[in-house]
A protein has these predicted regions:
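Short helix- or helix-capping micro-motifs
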Residues: 215
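Short, glycine-/small- and polar/acidic-enriched structural segments
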Residues: 32-179, 184-187, 203-209, 222-226, ...
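Active-site-proximal catalytic alpha-helix in oxidoreductases
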Residues: 233-240, 255-259
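Flexible, active-site-proximal loop/turn residues at the rims of small-molecule/cofactor binding pockets
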Residues: 27, 110, 211, 243, ...
Length: 312
């Protein structure tokens, strides 16, 4: 537990220092001729030749949506970029498969794992994943008396290990004077974890993003989350060493489009409505249960920086 907590806190410190200083298709340019910078949505200069960007895509996550929105709105197409996706529902698997993508968005443990073991290079921050949450059943002892450490001892909690969900759960246990030794943790990705929990497995459940809102809407009780705990749960953009060395122009455009797309989403109610609609579409494509309400709530709390914001 101490090792995981210290790793995440170390990552948070790095991020503070940084701050201080298959294809989905989309609209856009129907011509084979590259546009001039003045003709593109964000005033960026298109690549001279058609190039493919492969994204490590976090299924159902709000911090992956700028990629999908940019793709579907044609922002990549007009820059002579085709987009392909390698989809994941957890950071560890994404890092293990890093040879299959160029750029990704992922939580702190994934970034740390990637930097340590896979030569992944961090590019910037993209969220604090406030909706990383712990749930129990409404008729459980934990729902009735959530701050009583005695009733947490010996429980089984279902979550994907090596992720921000484990970090959040261990932080909550620590606040009760407990540790991982006092419980049983069953490793399972979030989508099957919710299904298993609803089928009666386990005593507690940790899930994030659209899956967390789905759990809440189905009647499960939210005990705590990253926002309530007040812990640093930063997520980041990262690229592979190969992409940084051999596709630097592509990676530069990719991260700029990512941040500029989030700015675009917030420029008008119509833009945000399109973003929500595309979020729902993405979840449907990825097999993540969602609806307009879930996706709107997830985007409402997305703590993604504006590219125009001054650093502090």
């Amino acid at each position: 537990m101490k090792k995981l907590l210290s790793l995440v806190l170390s990552f948070a410190l790095v991020c503070t220092l940084i701050s201080g200083c298959g294809p989905k298709g989309g609209g856009g340019n129907s011509s084979n001729q590259p546009l001039d910078a003045a003709e593109t949505t964000f005033g960026l200069t298109p690549l001279p030749e058609r190039t493919t960007l492969t994204i490590g895509f976090f299924s159902g996550s709000a911090h992956s949506m700028p990629w999908y929105i940019a793709d579907r709105m044609g922002f990549f197409d007009e820059l002579n970029i085709d987009v392909e996706y390698e989809s994941f529902i957890g950071g560890p698997a994404m890092m293990e498969a890093s040879a299959s993508w160029d750029i990704c968005d992922v939580g702190a443990p994934g970034i740390l794992n990637g930097m340590k073991n896979y030569d992944i290079q961090m590019l910037g921050l993209c969220d604090n994943e406030y909706n990383t949450a712990l749930f129990v059943r409404p008729d459980s002892p934990q729902a009735a008396d959530p701050t009583n450490p005695e009733i947490w001892k010996g429980i089984e909690c279902i979550l994907p290990t090596g992720t921000t969900l484990q970090y959040m759960f261990l932080s909550y246990l620590q606040s009760l004077g407990l540790s991982a030794d006092d419980v049983t943790i069953t490793n399972m990705d979030v989508t099957p974890a919710l299904t298993a929990f609803n089928a009666g497995e386990g005593d507690a459940l940790c899930v994030w993003n659209a899956v967390a809102y789905n759990a809440e809407d189905s009647g499960l009780v939210r005990i705590t989350d990253v926002s309530e705990l007040g812990i640093n749960n930063v997520c980041g953009l990262a690229a592979t060493k190969d992409a940084m060395e051999n596709k630097s122009d592509l990676i530069d455009l990719a991260w700029m489009v990512y941040y500029l797309t989030w700015d675009w989403c917030q420029q008008s109610e119509d833009n945000m409505a399109q973003a929500v609609e595309l979020y729902v579409e993405s979840c449907e494509d990825e097999g993540v249960v969602s609806n307009e309400s879930i996706c709107q709530r997830a985007l409402d709390i997305l703590s993604l920086i504006h590219i125009s914001e001054p650093t502090r």
